[in-house]
């Protein structure tokens, strides 16, 4: 034998001891109490937020009501108070909006906390499901162990059957060939009685064993039912989890806000979140109860299995003791006499009948075992199907990625916000364009009206100049007339008899002059009437222009409202279009996901086919093994029967030969002895007859035995041929099945590669489309920035144009007021002029009357000069003439004063116009300064924001640089660690290659030395072959490990490249921010220069204006006061005119009375007709002047009505201006809200881009994991091929062994003995390794007492390496732990190498069964077993008792209770680390 230092495979399965359900329930309960507290705090925060929302809504409603009331009463209040109140309300709105934004932030934080709770909830559910699955697997393992024990009981029964056949053979052989010494009859009877008692005892023991086997069957059925119930409960819990997930998904899909209703959406979100939390916590509690119940049932089942194992162990010990006792009794060697052949044959017959009964029972038991094996295979298949369904559901739930849905929702929201902003921008653009157009029209109209007004003012000035010239002429003529009258009076006084002709000529000249003057006055009046009509027309045009302006403003407001209404429809249209686009993208994504799922399903179907093929192969192997065992048992039975027959036939032949010799001797004696007596002849003849009958009987029996032997041999040959045929058929079916599976694997692999390529192309297309969308979003953001700048400039222009419009309207109002005041003054002056003219006419008439009377008196009588001087009437007339002259002088003086006042008014108007122009310039400059200050503030705010973002970016850059440095260091350390691991694995691979060479040489040497392999030689060759196969597998696993490490290196390199790409992106962002800051600083410098220029211009204007600017702040109030004073003066003039009209009416009445008196007095005279005609003319002129006065009164009333209309229109314009101011403030607030929405939208876009990058990273990581899983699956296929090759080698070995089985009887009996002894040893080793009894655990503990601390360290290392597989930080931790535990691993290697031993030889039949059944176990635990054999990792799956022995007592404190100690023990165990995470989270 070769003594080689090697590691031996430890095939023992160490059962894991779980903590009690009470402890887990305690930890879960504490976790959920914490979660309930958090939920209560969240609900209280939500209630507080709801109260705040209600308060905010109430404030908003109050604010809106106040705003409406102010709009209705705004026309009566002053502009200053309304603007201050609007500012206060704008500040209130801004504060409310800030509060709303804070509430939004708190709501987002609450949503994030709720998602975190849901994630922790899903993690705990997964971990508890894992515990449940572990319990289920432990129950299944115990069930498999019971099945193995059941098979071991059947093997023991077969062994007992073989022992009984041996007893029968020994009894049958020992009968005639006993010692020649005869025993007494009593001894023989006692011996027979003893043997029958022994056989009865054996039968009783066998019946007891069968009863125990039936009990085991019933217990196995109960275990199967428990497994079915556990599977049903697991399916129920999975369905409940699916329902919870579907509810959660349905709740997630219902979270859409409609039409931007922020308050209602927020409340709905909060209510939905609260209800969802309640539902989730209720579902969580219900699942807790279900999982607790399942865990309790699992614990009960585990206890039952432990009890059953203990009972089976007891039964096994009792059976072993009974067998030992019986073999001791049998091996004592009982003897009996030759005389009692009949009794011996009776005992043998009883034994044969018992043996046949036992054989029938064994056949029934084997059939039952096969039936049970079929049930077990079906149950295993169902379990695999359930696992496959669970994996499919898990994959489907993982494929339904929530991140993609969130990304789509965020994209929809951002696009909707962007469309809304575009619509608002378009709306503001249209409004601005409409206002610009309207302003241009108004400016054109105003220019035209100004030109016309200037023309008419020039006409009025020209007419006023003509009136002045005419007045001067009239005054000159009146002076000349007065001079002539004076001369005439002097002449009349000096000359007593003037000539009547001279007076008449003079009178005619005066009349002609008066007519010319009257004609000139008529022309002037007609021209004045035309000018008044033009002025009225101009006023009417101004009124129409005001109405047009009002209509235009109303139209603009209506257009704005209509545009707002139409914008909703446009928004809906854009929404629908974007939804259609998103639906198309969604459909494309769904198609790709469906293709991916289809390929996954195909791959799963392939794996299911592989697993089903593997189960079929295992079932075929089991069936082959069972059939081979059955055939070998039948062959051994047949060989035993043949040997029994031969052992019976040989003494019969010897007896027949003895009888023939005795017969011949007797015949010889008969022939020789003829002289004997009749007695002897009769006795000899009777003896001859008896001998002859006995010989015949023996010959018949011999022939019968030969026929039975021939039949048994034929049956044996049939069995051998049947066994060969079944093996060949199974080989052919397996080969065909393997070929079809290989073809299916090849086709599916090709399909999977094609699907993967198409999916990769589609994914690349989707990534390109998403990049395009991101570029479009960036372009839209840039366009939005440009639009914001344009909107700001347009708003500034709008404000400037509004200010200019206001100033122009004020100018127009002032000019209208001045025109009205001038018109009233002109009308008053003209009324005065008309009055004076009428007085002059009356005076002229009276003068003519007096002259006529004088002439009459002169012609009638020629009194003396004294009488003429003393006439009373003459004196009276002289007095009236004097009074009239005084009045004429007064009138002239008043006309001069009025003309002087008018010139002063014109100067004052010119001065006011100059002041208005200066005020307009100053106000425009002030507005420009205010706008530039606003722009500076805006740009300074932008600069501040950009600086703050630059600080953040610099911090991020520093952090990223630090992370990159640490990441580079970590990557270097990881690469060094990988290099070390690869080097170590390369050394191990080299060692394994050397070991493989040594093993192949040893196997060849053993086979060459042991050509005729028998017994131990076969076992050693099988052992070395198995060891060679395991070492080859270990070497392949090491190669695979190297590939995994290289793939991890590739993954880390890809992550490093991604980090570098993010660094480049951050640098680009930083440079863009720096450029934006530079541009902002340049714009601010330009604006400051503009402000300084405006201030210098303002100072220059103030210096130019001098002292007049002191009146500028009070200009508005003073203008209003002047306007009111002028209005009061006009009203006073109207009153004076009315009083004058009443006075003129009284004068008219006096004149009428005078006329009556004159008519009564001058009735006798000759020229009455002439006087009456003169008087009639005077009356017509008086009526004419009266009509003119009435027309003037009507015109004055019209002018007053027009003044009232202008005042009303002015008030309306002021109200409209206030409404425009309110609209402007609303537009400004809307712009501010739009800016806030834009910033929030940019933040959402940034968040969305971050989420998108995270989703891309997750997608790439999942794709890498998928590729790794595919590599693992290909490796599994390779292992399947290796297993098939091993199966073929085993089959060839089986055929070779079958050929060697047909040897000699001694070799067969020796082989049978070696099989029995090997079965006993193997059953003892398998039962000791597979059972979970306290004996095996204590034995393993005794073997591993020396290395508990090292096992604990290695357990930590393995746990960390399992839990942290793909992150660089965790690899760094694993490196540190590996460095810390190098000493322990080297120690473990030394200890494991010093403990290598050689296993005892395994019998061939058991070796065949072991090699056929333990392939799956080797395939499942190959990786773990490799690590155990290599010494890298030791067995980490300790029980909780062993872990409590290694528990660190320093973690405990003095104040800890028993519950705290138990919780700390459980949470410090790496197996229950997830409970620690959920407890802390």
Curated annotation (Swiss-Prot):
Cystine crosslinks: none
GO cellular component: virion component
Keyword field: Repeat, Virion
Stretches for region Disordered: 65-88, 1319-1403
Superkingdom of the source species: Viruses
Subcellular location(s) per record: Virion
Record's compositionally biased regions (Low complexity): 73-84, 1323-1336, 1393-1403
Protein name, as recorded: Structural protein ORF147
Organism: Trichoplusia ni ascovirus 2c (TnAV-2c)
